[in-house]
Amino acid sequence: MSTFVQKPAEVEKKWIIIDAEGLVVGRLATIVATRLRGKHKATFTPHVDDGDNVIVINAEKVAFTGKKYSDKKYYWHTGHPGGIKERTARQIIEGRFPERVVEKAIERMIPRGPLGRRQMKNLRVYAGSNHPHEAQQPTVLDVAALNKKNVRSA
């Protein structure tokens, strides 16, 4: 009896769609990151891109717990001396690219490296409810029903 090792040719990828409206960002990101890596499958192999293709819609309607909406800061550096920049979650969600909050939360839960970058290409995040992936016939994953803490109660 030897350890099962999946080969890239044996991978079966599914398409999953998740409605992020009212979901807590971190809890949504952990579920999506697990699906992207393929850790929810019995055939998980660490060095093979075994994850599913994930579509996240309504990313602009995600929820934060506590005061993170106004207090959480996202940092980046321009590359120039003294070029550290910051924005709050509120500024990003009300700005041009509100889906970036969800993308960054998921990206920071995926291992950094060539395989992680390939797995991140299987993620599509849209601010609104429209997406161009109807032809793939994605199955709906109801994250809100998995755990009551996944949804922010008002």
UniProtKB/Swiss-Prot annotation:
- Superkingdom of source: Bacteria
What Gene3D superfamilies does UniProt report for this protein, alphabetically?
Ribosomal protein L13
Its BP terms in the Gene Ontology are: negative regulation of translation; translation
What Pfam families does the record tag this protein with?
Answer: Ribosomal_L13
The UniProt keyword set, sorted, is:
Ribonucleoprotein, Ribosomal protein
Alphabetically, the GO molecular function entries are: mRNA binding; structural constituent of ribosome
Which GO cellular component terms are attached? cytosolic large ribosomal subunit
Question: What is the similarity comment for this entry?
Answer: Belongs to the universal ribosomal protein uL13 family.
- NCBIfam families noted in UniProt: rplM_bact (TIGR01066)
Role? This protein is one of the early assembly proteins of the 50S ribosomal subunit, although it is not seen to bind rRNA by itself. It is important during the early stages of 50S assembly.
Subunit structure, as described in the record:
Part of the 50S ribosomal subunit.
The name under which this protein is listed is Large ribosomal subunit protein uL13
Q: What is the lineage of its organism?
A: Bacteria, Pseudomonadati, Pseudomonadota, Alphaproteobacteria, Hyphomicrobiales
